[in-house]
Design a protein with these regions (language model features):
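Long, compositionally biased interface segments
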Residues: 220-280
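N-terminal low-complexity, intrinsically disordered segments
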Residues: 1-97, 278-280
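Secondary-structure boundary elements
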Residues: 111-135
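Glycine-rich, often proline-containing surface loops adjacent to acidic residues and nearby aromatics
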Residues: 10-17, 92-109, 135-144, 220-238
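Short, charged/polar micro-motifs that form catalytic or ligand-binding hotspots
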Residues: 102-113, 245, 249
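A short acidic (Asp/Glu
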Residues: 27-28, 115, 150-154
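Short glycine-rich, low-complexity/disordered patches
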Residues: 45-61, 129-146, 174-178, 258-280
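Aromatic/basic-lined ligand-recognition segments
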Residues: 72-87, 94, 136-229
Length: 280
């Protein structure tokens, strides 16, 4: 039978990404990092790590691509877990800053209200600083769920977990004799200047026996990624610093509501009811 990765929910990771319409300058990036140093310290993300990204700029004359360094920063908190009688540190929360985007990730999801409050405390001051110089290009909400098959792999049936009548999953996975992947997506216009990307990625995987908790070692699993991304076309969406908080709150709540609706279309309704997941 299929089980969720943890008793309270199946969410292995949640990610919220705010993408800028163009890369921030080095001066603004330094201001953003200072804001994040304050906000992340207040929430307990005390581990810091510099990261180096790059973008390719095309020169007009020779049409050559020139790599340009883009310094960024990771802010992380860790939690102690026990894996096969060994105590290990694993990342529990992370804020990633690159001149192109800000992202908040959690591996210890409890509830939407709690996570929205946390990510707002972490990201809002930085976004308020960023919109003084640039516009917002996109906002994305992504859930990665994992389900574990507790039994003989020969008895695995994808339709016991997934809805075999949805057009969001490739139908051939329900007759696949072994591992499979189904990645689908579509764009829908929201307004004349924005569109929404909906993504559903289903990946059947056999977990390694080494380095995994006993509940996962050697098991057949299904990872289910559902994501919604609102993209603001042309020159992006412009805000004043005072308007950002209201926009971010309403935007994230709207994406969350539609993410629940997307989940209902993908998960087998009987399984969802039995495990108190969103269902019809």
């Amino acid at each position: 039978m299929w089980k969720m990765i943890r008793p309270e929910n199946a969410i292995e990771q949640m990610v919220v990404t705010v993408r800028f319409s163009e890369p921030l300058s080095s001066l603004v990036s330094k201001r953003i990092i200072r804001e994040l140093e304050r906000s992340t310290s207040n929430v307990g993300l005390t581990n810091r790590q510099a990261v180096q990204g790059f973008q390719l700029n095309m020169q007009a004359a020779g049409q050559n691509f020139v790599p340009v360094a883009m310094p960024g920063m990771l802010f992380q908190s860790t939690s102690v877990f026990r894996v096969n009688d060994e105590v290990v540190n694993q990342i529990s929360q992370q804020v990633e800053f690159q001149p192109t985007h800000l992202a908040y990730s959690t591996w210890t999801y409890k509830s939407w209200d709690k996570e929205r409050e946390t990510l707002t405390r972490l990201l809002l001051p930085a976004i308020e600083t960023a919109v003084q110089s640039i516009t917002i290009g996109a906002v994305r909400l992504q859930y990665l769920d994992r389900f574990v098959f507790d039994g003989d792999k020969a008895a695995v049936q994808a339709r016991d977990l997934l809805n075999d009548e949805t057009d969001l999953i490739a139908p051939n996975i329900f007759t696949a004799p072994d591992l499979y992947h189904s990645h689908t997506g579509r764009f829908d216009n929201v307004t004349s200047r924005s569109r929404r990307l909906s993504q559903v990625n289903v990946d059947s995987q056999d977990m390694l026996s080494d380095g995994q908790p006993d509940a996962l070692a050697g098991r057949r699993t299904i990872s289910l990624l559902t994501a919604l991304e609102d993209q603001f076309l042309e020159s992006g969406k412009e805000f004043s610093s005072e308007e950002v908080a209201g926009f971010l709150s309403s935007q994230l709540d709207d994406l969350h509501v539609h993410a629940l609706a997307l989940s209902k279309r993908v998960i087998n309704n009987k399984f969802a009811q039995e495990h108190r997941l969103p269902h019809e």
